[in-house]
Structures are given as structure tokens and as C-alpha cells.
Design a protein with these regions (language model features):
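Conserved SAM-binding loop
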Residues: 107-108
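Conserved SAM/SAH-binding beta-strand->alpha-helix loop
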Residues: 100
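Glycine-rich SAM-binding Motif I of class I
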Residues: 79-83
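Conserved class I S-adenosyl-L-methionine
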Residues: 68-77
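C-terminal substrate-binding/active-site "lid" region of AdoMet-derived donor-dependent transferases
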Residues: 146-202
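Conserved SAM-binding strand-loop segment of SAM-dependent methyltransferases
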Residues: 114-123
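A short SAM/SAH-binding and catalytic strip from SAM-dependent methyltransferases
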Residues: 135-147
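S-adenosyl-L-methionine
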Residues: 1-66
Length: 206
């Protein structure tokens, strides 16, 4: 079963698989954290498949000169995204919100020395994450029910908690979900097929 799931992941990246594997090996050798993955049997919750380092590398190139203070990863898994950007940005705060025990406890232990990183175990579909007034949100397909994910994105888009601008980064979200964001400024979109890729949006609340 595990082998079939891994094979399914590889097949989903098609012709970009060689590039994906290259960046996975590169950052693994650099000692980056968050390389664990697990498969979910809970309806609505996606497998914990870390965002490819290739995507993170490209996203970083695009946002490295954009100012933000608080980065929230909704569905943070084993912490790969937070670990990656914590090494790229100075003087930033990070919050990871994760539902599953295993991933949450892993992150709590492995990131405990970082005062600027906090992990919270909650169901992001019910949790009031807007209370933190974040100006950067990252979602790597945390939910496989479009209606629920669209509801979360609308909360972020319509948030009155943050009077400034918000950076919104979505990974591996399908086109039906992205339609609800067509009125936002799209900084960059990169997809290798219909389901695998990322989009970066800018919400200007000023």
C-alpha cells in the first residue's frame, strides 16, 4: 500500500520528476527538516506529502524581496515549509497549524529551540487562525474537499483583522479552488500539470 502511494506521487509529477528528485536530494544533503510523509484515512484530510523543494526554491525567488512579519502554514505537516523559509528570512515569525498528532509532536520536538516558531494542533477548518493577524499564508493542499478549502480562502481574502497587505501562497490546488481568487493580484503561477504547481497572490487591504 505504501509503495503504491509513493508510486502515485511520483507519477503525478510526470516529466518534472527528475528536477523534483534533484532538489529533494540537494536539500536533504543540506540537512533541511520536514522530510516525513504519512497517508491519511480521514475523510477530507489530504496525505501529509511535503511541498517539493523545487517549488519552495522557485517561490522563495519570487517573494524574497516582499516584506512580511508573520508567516502561517495552514496544514504544516512535518514542518518542511517553515524550516525552509526560516532559513531564508531573518527576523520573521512562523506559526504552523497541524491536525494530526504525529506531525504536530514531531514539529514540537524538532523546532523547540526556535523562539520565532510556534506549532498549534488544531483543525484549521474550525480554528480562528485570523486572530494572529498574519500577513503571509501558505497552504499546501491541506484539504481535499473544494468547498471547505474555498471557505478558508474566502476567510483570508475577506479578513478585516489585517489592515495591511497579505501574501497568499497556494500549492497543488486545483483550478476550481483558484477560481475564487480571480479578483486578486496574481504575482506568479507555475503548474507542471492540472494539479501540481503553485500560485502566489497579493491581497491589498490598504
Amino acid at each position: 500500500m505504501i509503495f503504491k502511494n509513493i508510486l502515485r506521487i511520483f507519477k503525478s509529477y510526470q516529466l518534472s520528476l527528475i528536477v523534483i528528485i534533484f532538489y529533494e536530494l540537494l536539500y536533504f544533503l543540506k540537512g533541511n527538516k520536514g522530510n516525513n510523509f504519512t497517508f491519511s484515512n480521514i475523510e477530507g484530510m489530504t496525505d501529509n506529502i511535503p511541498c517539493p523543494y523545487y517549488f519552495l526554491y522557485k517561490i522563495n525567488k519570487k517573494i524574497k524581496n516582499i516584506n512580511f512579519n508573520l508567516f502561517i502554514d495552514l496544514g504544516s505537516g512535518s514542518g518542511r515549509v517553515i524550516d525552509f523559509f526560516n532559513k531564508k528570512f531573518e527576523n520573521k515569525n512562523f506559526i504552523g497549524i497541524e491536525y494530526f498528532d504525529k506531525q504536530f509532536l514531531y514539529c514540537k520536538e524538532n523546532f523547540k529551540k526556535y523562539k520565532n516558531i510556534k506549532f498549534i494542533q488544531e483543525d484549521l477548518t474550525k480554528y480562528n487562525f485570523l486572530q494572529y493577524n498574519a500577513d503571509c499564508y501558505f497552504l499546501n493542499e491541506p484539504i481535499n474537499i473544494d468547498k471547505s478549502l474555498i471557505g478558508i480562502l474566502k476567510k483570508i481574502k475577506e479578513s478585516k483583522n489585517n489592515k495591511g497587505s497579505i501574501l497568499l501562497i497556494l500549492v497543488n490546488c486545483n483550478k476550481n479552488v483558484l477560481k475564487c481568487l480571480e479578483d486578486l493580484q496574481c504575482i506568479e503561477t507555475f503548474y507542471i500539470n492540472d494539479k501540481k504547481g503553485y500560485s502566489i497572490y497579493y491581497i491589498n487591504n490598504k
